[in-house]
Amino acid sequence: NSIGLDKSELAIKTAEKNRKLLGLKNVQFFNQDIFEYNQSKADLLLCNPPYLAKHEIDSLEQSVRDYDPLSALTDFKKGTSFYKHLISNFNKLVKKNGIMLLEIPFSAVTDDIISINKNFNANKSLFYKDLEGKNRVIKIY
């Protein structure tokens, strides 16, 4: 079984539509904020958290600002609050021997995310690089 969380009702409706189109049976979606989630632990937690810092919003291309809700792009702070929450709560969110995969940006907050991982994570971790050789995903296990 798999679950999906999003605080956006529109995102949940879109996910449900895609689930049906793909014929997926064992997937449930919940309209819930990850900061308030305290249900069952996951074997695999996969997330592309909002990572833009508040000051980066103005430099976004207009097409991005028109298409995506700002809450999907930024935490309206430094861009790291989701990472800090997810990484520091790894053992509450992920089962023993489970895995957390987080997309990370190539931006000013990348080093902050790496520091958060070093400060809050007692588990193993590694980074996957993109085609340009830049860290793009952190795996915590």
Feature locations, PLM:
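Conserved SAM/SAH cofactor-binding pocket of Class I
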Residues: 1-57
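Mobile active-site "lid"/loop adjacent to the S-adenosyl-L-methionine
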Residues: 51-81
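Conserved Class I SAM-dependent methyltransferase catalytic core
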Residues: 77-140
